[in-house]
Amino acid sequence: MKAETKKARWVWLTGALVLLTLGALILSALLDKPLQGYMERKLNARLKGYTVHLGGVRFHPFGFALDLTDVVIVQEANPQPPVAWIPKLSASVQWRALLYGRVVADFLLDRPAVYLDLRHVRAEQKSRVPLRERGWQEALEAIYPLKINEFRIVEGDLTYVDEGPFRPLHLSLINFRAENIRNIRSKEREYPSDLYLEGLVFDTGTVRLDGHADFLARPHIGVKSRFTLEQVEVDYFKPIVSRYNIVLREGTLSSTGELEYAPHIKVIHLQKLAVEDVQLEYVHKARTAVAEKRVAKKVVQKA
């Protein structure tokens, strides 16, 4: 009799757990669509000059996790093509932080792709609102109720297309990790969070950042990091130097150094700069003659 009673209890307990699980899944599915509309409104209320469209939102009640899928970001001045597409953005509780009595979040951007061209850049230059004040940090923080402690990007992609017959500037397989973000507000030029970034430049060169950041700095984050560029094709710099009548052909660039970029300081210290097999020409153009004379005059004055 006792064995039958115990068996019945297990049957009821198992049934209750199954029903609870099914109920949670059904509730989650019913909430997804309303949550998607709410999340879009919340994000767009914080952004200036940009609009977010969400393909879907999925809440996972058991892990208290949130997935945003097919996230598309457009610049309102130039809505086509979009400036960013994120197949999946996941936010969840950082469970290991609970061991230290901290209730914080992990954020993961899976294979995000960013596309910029000269129209996007010129629209930013004309705008009265600086890019750093567009509300990006506020929008990111609005996604999840917990404060972000770890932020990761896996296999990101960045493309910039300039005018003229230049190859697009392309960074691929970008992996980024920032930890200990929700530290206390730091004094100026103190960077409490660890960060690391690596990626490919033009499929052959590499870029690495290894340093620290202050993600609570305002109006934008502060970074102090060592950097390494290895075997980067000079094609990467053609659109930039062409504005100064300089033509680059072939060759690679490698460099190491330190950079500091924060609200009150922007400094780069080069420790090594190596340029190999580069062909460089200066081309005089009639339409830039006045600007050339102005630059030459400044050089003479400084000399």
Regions found by a protein language model. Give the residues of each.
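Flexible beta-edge/linker motif
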Residues: 56-123, 136-161, 185-192, 256-283, ...
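Elongated, acidic membrane-bridging lipid-handling scaffolds
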Residues: 12, 129-236, 241
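Short hydrophobic/aromatic-rich motifs at helix boundaries and adjacent loops
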Residues: 10-15, 27-28, 42-44, 62-65, ...
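N-terminal type II signal-anchor transmembrane helix
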Residues: 2-47
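Amphipathic hydrophobic-ligand
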Residues: 49-51, 68, 77-92, 131-134, ...
